[in-house]
Amino acid sequence: LREGLIVFTYIHSNAHLEMTKELLKNKIIGIAYEDIIDKNGKFPLLSPMSELAGKGGFLAALHYGQTIYGGTGVLFSRVTGVNTPVITIIGCGHTGIGAAEMAASLGNRVRILDIGKEVMEEAKAKLPSNVEFLYSNRTNLLKCLKDTDVLMNCILWDKTRKDHLVYKDD
């Protein structure tokens, strides 16, 4: 690493503090894909990584749902003669859509909660019929939690917020 080097990549500085300190110490210019905002306030370079994160998140649920990892042992996939698992996803952005695509492709019953009617309509056109869309509010979330096998948080959350979407008592 040398002074003046320009690094243009996914940096995720909050999650990689030591790396960030090294970049700063060596006077390297770091441009993080995930922090680039377009004129509409969107994060265009974060979109593909977010979709991958959603798909990878569901794959992680498959993995950690196994009893050897402390999970329930439910296979998060449709199997004849067994109750279809329910996957609830909070957020209908790129991450939520990626998670929903992966979960739905295995025949799960998928529910997405979001506050944006337009984004849900757009997602509805992309996703299969085993995906249900609900307005995200406390009442709907609590109803969904009753029979959810996997709950995925797929929303961009302001780092300064101190409130929660789901509480232990839920």
Language model region names:
Residues 20-21, 100, 120, 167-170:
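Short amphipathic alpha-helical segments and helix-helix/interface helices
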Residues 45-49, 125-129, 169:
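Short low-complexity, flexible loop/linker segments enriched in glycine and/or proline
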